[in-house]
């Protein structure tokens, strides 16, 4: 069951990423500037983020199979519309469909994981889902780009639509929501639905999950979905093949890091925020060095940037683990939906801001951005890193205060490490 869901998610990531690797061709096809092209993706992500809570509620009611099936069909329709589009409004409508279908997929697959892999294996399988699903990005970075250059825009995106139809058929025939004997969800009234959503939001575990997802995810997402490729090719002067290889490296790093983070979360669940802070510190540090580097950054530094960004996706999965452990089973869908809003809202706002800054600093409708424009544009990330950090710190404090009331007092990390090295009883 998990394999079918994983394939559906990988294809959703492929659909989501397909425009990013074709950003330059999109500007040429639609005679659009950076702001217009970024608007395609911003609206796609806005729809994705805006539907997370409604999809989460529907998921708790209808189950994963129906939601994943609906998502696959909707994304296939969006790619077909994009294949035929010749103007900006039609292209925007196409990406809105892709965003709507994408919104139905990931948290539905996470619900499959929660039912088929209960207990301590769930964090690891959640990480594997998020990371192996990024294979779709590799398919977008290599086969899709190759097909786009060898054939045409219409043929490439029509092929993407056909892939979505095949996935929908597989889900229809092979996927089940939960093992036999699992109680089916029941319909609830509007008042009970509203009360459940309020309880989900009031839970500090949901909110720390949201801010964890925000602060760890958006930089890597922005880089992989749209602005990384132009930054590497136009801003840093890399060959297109080298840039595509770096985007693939980002995914491969995540595949390696994800299982490690999953095991660490399962082993030390009360220290998950330490992993979040470590990923954030590494991301901010390497971006600062790249943006302040005089002239174009050397290739090893860009490789380091991509390696660090590769940890962002796995880091954001920790947010779902917070929501999973702090919410009851009947609220898993809505809690995951709330968490998933964080990173994608930050991503879409960052994508839009980067496009706007590039257009302001670049005359006319030219896509020939200089390095100074890219530096200014990518600096908007610091705003969202600050917002996310404050949110994580605030809600971590609330969770730890609740633990203290329950008799669980966490030692400072340095004291816990010192105690473990001294051979004393391990602290939580």
Model-derived segments and spans:
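Cytoplasmic helix-loop-helix junction between adjacent transmembrane helices
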Residues: 94-133
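Helix-to-loop junctions at the C-terminal end of transmembrane segments
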Residues: 51-63, 257-271
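Juxtamembrane intracellular "pre-TM" segments in multi-pass secondary transporters
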Residues: 178-210, 409-424
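Extracytoplasmic gate region of multi-pass secondary transporters
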Residues: 19-20, 204-258, 350-355
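Helix-breaking motifs and short loop linkers at transmembrane-helix boundaries and internal kinks
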Residues: 31, 63, 84-90, 101, ...
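Helix-loop-helix hairpin linking two adjacent transmembrane segments in secondary transporters
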Residues: 128-179
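Cytoplasmic membrane-interface "Motif A"-like loop-to-helix N-cap segments
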Residues: 61-71, 266-281
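Conserved MFS/SLC helix-loop-helix module at the cytosolic interface between two early adjacent transmembrane helices
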Residues: 50-89
